[in-house]
Swiss-Prot record:
Name under which the protein is recorded: GPN-loop GTPase 3
Species: Candida glabrata (strain ATCC 2001 / BCRC 20586 / JCM 3761 / NBRC 0622 / NRRL Y-65 / CBS 138)
Family of the protein in this entry: Belongs to the GPN-loop GTPase family.
Function: Small GTPase required for proper nuclear import of RNA polymerase II and III (RNAPII and RNAPIII). May act at an RNAP assembly step prior to nuclear import.
Record keywords, A-Z: GTP-binding, Hydrolase, Nucleotide-binding
Disulfide pairings: none
UniProt motif Gly-Pro-Asn (GPN)-loop: location: 70-72
Entry superkingdom: Eukaryota
Subunit description: Heterodimers with GPN1 or GPN2. Binds to RNA polymerase II (RNAPII).
Record-linked Pfam families: ATP_bind_1
Site (Stabilizes the phosphate intermediate): 72
Keyword Hydrolase in record: yes
Binding sites annotated in the UniProt record for GTP: 13-18, 173-176
Annotated GO biological process: mitotic sister chromatid cohesion; protein import into nucleus
Length: 271
């Protein structure tokens, strides 16, 4: 059985920790073992205990207090310290060969755009520890239901996809917060979006000088295949199971077992 890791990425407030807890709960229900690896030195308490916690090595509050750094500077310092002490991470991971490790990552995008911290950790996990990795990038549905904000979120997800060079699954989280307010037809347009159509909608509320920029961004999103998001309701077991089936497929978990293909289409009516 493969050594599998799932990186949970996305901006602050996207529901990453809730998603991690939902995956753990679902796996316990179906008899699979998984552990959460907390890579956020500023993490809040979780429903499930972290099996591995970066705060046992270094914490954001301690760095801010001792070095008089702001939150972002302290976060970067924490990860630079982790990179110098990867033997600690190796020892903590130990022999989790037959179980999922779910890496709950911080929301600051600069950790993989401005400095190569997360990409270096990914390479270490793949090269030294022989992990099959998959990245999930969460965007919250109440935020991206606006066309212009959708493109902002899609570009941040694309940055993660390109810089981490991992199999990549985009997730539209907190769908339960808006599915009663917006019609199914409108929600489907964001799960399987027509980038050019959304760009035209965004143009209606912008100065005409930005129209060409919108079209270029839409073309970029289309070219990189950022055309589908999986819907997530964290309290809906079927929603969580569908996303897990995609993760299993791209990581080739338990190749010896009978493979179950993920759904070809995501239907909002199933939620």
């Amino acid at each position: 059985m493969s050594r599998v890791g799932l990186l949970v990425l996305g901006p602050a407030g996207a529901g990453k920790s809730t998603f991690c807890n939902s995956i753990i709960s679902h796996m316990q229900t179906i008899g699979r073992r998984a552990h959460i690896v907390n890579l956020d030195p500023a993490a809040e308490p979780s429903k499930y205990e972290f099996t591995i916690d970066i705060r046992d090595l270094i914490s954001l509050d301690d760095v801010m207090e001792e070095l008089d750094l702001g939150p972002n500077g302290a976060l970067i310092y924490c990860f630079e310290y982790l990179m110098k002490n990867l033997d600690w991470l190796d020892e903590e991971i130990g022999d989790y060969n037959d179980e999922y490790l779910i890496f709950d990552c911080p929301g600051q995008i600069e950790l993989y755009t401005h400095i190569p911290v997360l990409p270096n950790i990914v390479r270490h996990l793949q090269g030294q520890l022989n992990f099959n990795l998959c990245a999930t990038y969460l965007l919250e549905a109440p935020f991206v239901i606006d066309s212009s904000k959708f493109f902002s979120g899609a570009l941040s997800a694309m940055s993660a996809m390109i810089l981490l060079e991992l199999p990549h699954i985009n997730v539209l989280s907190k769908l339960d917060m808006i599915k009663d307010e917006y019609g199914k037809k409108k929600l489907k347009r964001f799960l399987n979006p027509d980038a050019m159509l959304l760009a035209n909608e965004a143009d209606q509320n912008l100065n005409p000088k930005f129209h060409h920029l919108n079209q270029c961004i839409a073309n970029l999103v289309d070219d990189f295949g950022m055309v589908q998001f999986l819907p997530l309701e964290a309290n809906n077991p079927e929603s969580v199971a569908t996303i897990l089936s995609y993760v299993d497929d791209v990581t080739q978990w338990a190749e010896a077992q009978e493979q179950k293909e993920p759904k070809d289409q995501i239907d909002i009516e199933d939620l």
